[in-house]
Amino acid sequence: MGDTTAYLRRGIREIICLALFFFTFLACEYLFDVRIAEFVSPNEVVIYESLVLGASVIGFFVRPILYYHRPHAIDATSDVTGVLLVAALLLLIMAVRVEVVIAGGLVACCALGYCGSTAHANFARRFARTPCLARAAALSYAMGVLVQVLNHMVMPVGIPQQAVLVVCAIAQVALLHGARRAKLRDESDPNFEPSAAGLSVDALEYGAKWHDDPEAKAAFRRAVVRLTVATAYLSSVFAALNAGFTTLHAVGAVDLGDWPRLLLVMSSLAAGALFDLHGRSYMNIGMTCAAILSTLSFFVLIVDGNGGNELAATIIFYLGSGFFVVFFTTKYAAVSLYARWSYFWPCMGRVVNNVCSMLVTAPAVAIISSQNVLAAIGAALVMFVGIAITLLGQLGQRADDAAMRDGLPLATDDLGGDLAPTCSDPEPVEAAELTSDERLDAFVATFGLTERERDILEVLVVSDQSVQDIATTLFLSRSTLYRHISSINKKAGTASRVALINFFWSWTPKD
């Protein structure tokens, strides 16, 4: 528990940024549904919603492309994106014509995709090599959903709720800008070492190493294809369910912002706790069970011609949806560690989900409207077969030990058994059950650190501050702090601040 708390405390900025993205994305989607329902029929609301959400894919792709090919354009593009996001939200709020509502939704979702790509990448770089990745993802999603529910249920309808959305969008953009500029400010220092407060896992350090080996590169591609297909099948299930509930919301049968949405908070937190058990080896079977449970709500919508069981269907749907978001956020964050373009992959779960939503929504609305049970059963069987093949086909393949050889535990199922032969050389070790203080004392004794070096290491491994802030806290100059860090690196056999922090948390004392 102590180590988990330390990991979460170090990554609180990344958790908050991702939570703000979840809130603004969900709240923008809800606002668009409300506004577009004023101009079109209930069955058309979800069609327009899927198209608007699909526009976010553009933003999700733009940021990684800029990061790798036009890094000097990121600051200007981010500033423009922030302005466009706020302007689009205001346009969406004040529009009096359907064309303007659609335009506002398209621009807002595209800008949110840009912000979400950054938030997911920062989150993945922080938590991908930690044993609490799923719990961190669950915490972010739960926070975002909780803010949405409280805003919907506590704040007065209209301007107050809309003001909260705009303010949170501005806060999200400001936090992401602040994180990048702090990183650039530190990099300008001649003694700079990559900060754990920034993007602490570099593709050059991990992804490129895997892709230098042809066998590992091929295994990565197979694993990504398998994960993407699984996510597509799952997305189709939940997109069909979302289509049904959005239509019910448009006709006033249910309110998707009301108290049942709190079940998303509970289900996501439960998913995070379950998925992190035993090196995330229960993720696939857990997600499969959640998908089966959620499909029950689809059949409730189909067979309940009298419309009396919408609440029961909504509850079942939300219990599964929380698992799904935590699943694809965690999976792609872990997989990104092995990618050469590591900035590109963390948001791919959301991209696949939105693309599948565009493709599945219209057929799902047709099936639900016709109440065709046979068509629903046929579609469900196809989805279940695909999910079983892609998720449950790996259960006999264990790669936990191999995945642990390069530091902290990674999920076996994140990349499957294919990558096991190509991991690095050291033998796997069992993680010791130590508190942070016990680990620190043992580390200091083993590597012969001085008392001052101990104080510095204690701050270094739990702080998300910049080098300048840490130096100020310890009453040291930057150059003196760098000399101490260099000395600790030399004694521990590490090459950088990031490597030292990762080594500290993965290190196990010898008896």
Please report, for each region that a protein language model flagged, where it lies by residue.
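Intracellular loop-helix junctions on the cytosolic face of multi-pass helical membrane proteins
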Residues: 1-2, 129-130, 145-232
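Helix-loop boundary and gating motifs at the non-cytosolic
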Residues: 2-55, 226-252
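Transmembrane alpha-helices of Major Facilitator/SLC transporters
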Residues: 53-64, 144, 256-280, 353-361
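Hydrophobic core of transmembrane alpha-helices in multi-pass small-molecule transporters
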Residues: 99-116, 308-325
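Intracellular juxtamembrane helix-capping segments at the cytosolic ends
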Residues: 113-127, 323-338
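Glycine-rich segments within core transmembrane alpha-helices of 12-TM secondary carriers
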Residues: 128-155, 344-364
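C-terminal transmembrane helical hairpin of 12-TM major facilitator-type secondary transporters
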Residues: 284-324
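Helix-turn-helix DNA-binding segment
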Residues: 412-483, 491, 502-511
